[in-house]
From Swiss-Prot:
Region (Disordered): 56-76, 226-247
Organelle transit peptide residues: 1-59
Pfam family, one: MFS_1
A GO CC term assigned to this protein in UniProt: chloroplast membrane
Protein name: Probable anion transporter 5, chloroplastic
Family, as annotated: Belongs to the major facilitator superfamily. Sodium/anion cotransporter (TC 2.A.1.14) family.
Underlying gene: PHT4;5
Segments of skewed composition (Gly residues): 63-76
Alphabetized UniProt keyword annotations: Chloroplast, Ion transport, Membrane, Plastid, Transit peptide, Transmembrane, Transmembrane helix, Transport
Ranges annotated as biased composition (Low complexity): 228-247
Subcellular location: Plastid, Chloroplast membrane
Biological source species: Oryza sativa subsp. japonica (Rice)
Length: 471
């Protein structure tokens, strides 16, 4: 439930700002759409992901500073999360990840709830967005670490799909329920409600954690008696350990020093994940930020129609994810090499949107609803990445999965700032959707596919820290 309410809050923000699009074309805000995006119910409130942020700034005319400002205003929350992710992800390896997840959800839930109170006070508003960025920066990595340590590889795709699929579900809920809530209770109520949902989730999660800790103690008693139960008790112990929850600050700092950062960047597989995450995020953020404007301007849909069309990609993602995850797990269970499965899924996730964007960027003389169907299908099929890239961090290292996600997620946040702004600038300069929106995304999808097929690997890697050479 946690990821869903945060994704829903993003939709609420978008609903509040949708009326701005009624002005002249060059001063219109891109109508926001949620990440499909990014712990099972927790990420129902979190946009992965991703990453709730205000809609990009208005595309300025050349005399007002150029279109480059088109996305600059959207980077506040992203920038806050971006610079915190690698270090915050490292914390999840040392401090009990359930506790980190709770802290993250509490942080951005409270930060969301106080937005109405600080809306007219810029420093307070900026602080709230920073808190949202910090809270969201740790949540996906904490969830990833829990999956890596407690879910076997044959079930990993479904676990990731359930966790990160909450983002799409939350986006759909937000688009459906935010407008009537705003209409009947006022815009402030949306932020109060979604903040409260996060706190309620934390209370329920605390109860669940205590139950698991008690169960873990029972397992330990059985093991001490020499009656080790069959199954994955070792995995449970590694993810739910009272000792890990009591890590001191000194242990935390020492553990951060022990993280083999240099070894990460010596791995071709890690670099493949970094570039793939960047490429996927470029297409994701730029398309989902600007497609509603494209629907409105290029396909002559009115604002209401464009807003309703925006629910289709996350809805399609939910459907595709429910198919892709069992497909990947079944292949692995039947003996297909894990690396091959991850490459197949990620290739589908990249080539599908690239193909449909190519079809949408040329004049085929098809009606608008077919263009909408093309783009919706492509973006929905990109959810195969949850069984590709998003499982690979855990495949190659259970111990450092959360940090690896933090690294790739940091790079993946850059297109949300740079790509959205660049799209606005190119659109003002060229007046071409094909050049400004589709061509860059197609380029990154194709090059991302090539790099992924060449260098990606799901083989477990030992990232032992290199000893300094003695003089």
């Amino acid at each position: 439930m946690a990821a869903s309410a945060s994704a829903s809050a993003l939709q609420a923000e978008r609903c509040l700002l949708v009326g701005v699009g009624a002005g002249p074309r060059r001063h219109r805000l891109p109508l926001r759409m949620p990440p499909p995006l990014h712990a099972p119910p927790a990420l129902l409130l979190l946009p992965h992901r991703r990453r709730r942020r205000w809609p990009p700034a208005v595309r300025a005319s050349p005399g007002e500073g150029g279109g480059g400002g088109g996305g600059g205003g959207g980077g506040g929350g992203l920038a806050g999360a971006l610079e915190k992710r690698p270090v915050m992800s490292a914390l999840t390896v040392v401090v009990m990840n359930m506790r980190v997840l709770e802290i993250g959800v509490v942080a951005w839930s409270l930060a969301t709830a106080i937005i109405p109170a600080v809306a007219g006070f810029m420093p307070g508003l900026v602080l709230s967005r920073i808190l949202v960025g910090i809270g969201e920066g740790v949540s996906p990595s904490a969830a990833t670490d829990l999956i890596a340590r407690s879910i076997p590889v044959q079930e990993r795709s479904r676990a990731v799909a359930v966790v990160f699929g909450g983002l799409s579900f939350g986006s759909v809920l937000g688009l459906l329920f935010a407008p009537p809530i705003i209409q009947n209770l006022g815009w402030e109520s949306v932020f109060y409600i979604f903040g409260l949902l996060g706190i309620i989730w934390c209370l329920g999660f605390q109860s669940l954690k205590e139950q698991q800790l008690r169960g873990n103690e029972d397992i330990q008693v059985i093991q001490d008696l020499g009656q080790s139960p069959s199954g994955s008790s070792d995995l449970i112990s590694s993810s739910v350990s009272p000792k890990s929850s009591e890590s001191s600050l000194g242990e935390l700092m020492n553990s951060l020093k022990d993280v083999p950062w240099r070894e990460f960047f010596k791995s071709k597989a890690v670099w493949a994940m970094i570039y793939a995450h960047f490429c996927g995020s470029w297409g994701h953020y730029t398309c989902l930020s600007w497609l509603p404007t494209f629907f409105s301007e290029e396909l002559d849909l009115n604002l209401t129609e464009a807003a309703w069309v925006s629910v289709l990609p996350p809805l399609g993602s939910m459907i595709i994810t429910s198919i892709a995850a069992p497909f990947a797990d079944n292949l692995i269970s039947n003996g297909v090499d894990t690396t091959k499965v991850r490459k197949i899924c990620q290739t589908i996730a990249f080539l599908s949107p690239a193909t449909f964007m190519m079809l949408s960027s040329v004049d085929l003389g098809v009606p608008p609803w077919e263009i909408v169907a093309f783009l919706t299908s492509g973006l929905a099929l990109s959810s195969f990445a949850l069984s590709g890239l998003y499982c690979t961090h855990q495949d190659i290292s259970r111990e450092y999965a959360s940090i690896l996600l933090g690294i790739t997620n940091t790079v993946g946040a850059v297109p949300g700032i740079v790509g959205v702004a660049l799209t606005g600038y190119l659109l003002d300069t060229t007046h071409s959707w094909s050049i400004s929106l589709f061509a860059p995304s197609i380029f990154f999808y194709l090059t991302g596919t090539a790099v992924w097929l060449a260098f990606a690997s799901s083989e477990p890697q030992e990232f032992s820290k290199s000893e300094p050479e003695s003089s």
